[in-house]
């Protein structure tokens, strides 16, 4: 787990699973920013850091984002992720998760 701090306050965090369920590639399990600290570049900084860590393990990075969270999906798309699949009912009945991936090699 990696955290973003402002002073001593945790304002966001991210958690990477080194060998996720998607062909053993690293998987971004969660990235979360306190609502009052969003749109300040903290999420981007945590994502960039997560990608640097993932690149030490593999050349691809995976994540899923829920269909009810289009803002998060757009965030990942702006940062080079593309949807590579859909997984209905992965975490909750009636919710589709979009499987997204990014090639980390430039």
Where are each of the predicted segments found?
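Acetyl-CoA-dependent GNAT
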Residues: 1-36, 47-49, 53, 89
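Conserved beta-strand-loop-alpha-helix junction that forms the acyl-donor binding cleft
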Residues: 38, 63-73, 89-95
């Amino acid at each position: 787990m990696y955290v973003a701090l402002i002073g001593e306050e945790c304002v966001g965090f991210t958690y990477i699973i080194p060998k996720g369920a998607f062909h053993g590639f690293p998987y971004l399990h969660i990235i979360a920013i306190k609502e009052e600290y969003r749109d300040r570049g903290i999420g981007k900084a945590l994502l960039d850091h997560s990608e640097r860590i993932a690149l030490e393990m593999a050349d691809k990075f995976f994540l899923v984002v829920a269909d009810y969270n289009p803002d998060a999906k757009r965030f990942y798309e702006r940062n080079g992720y593309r949807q590579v699949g859909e997984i209905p009912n992965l975490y909750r009945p009636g919710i589709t998760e979009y499987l997204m991936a990014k090639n980390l090699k430039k």
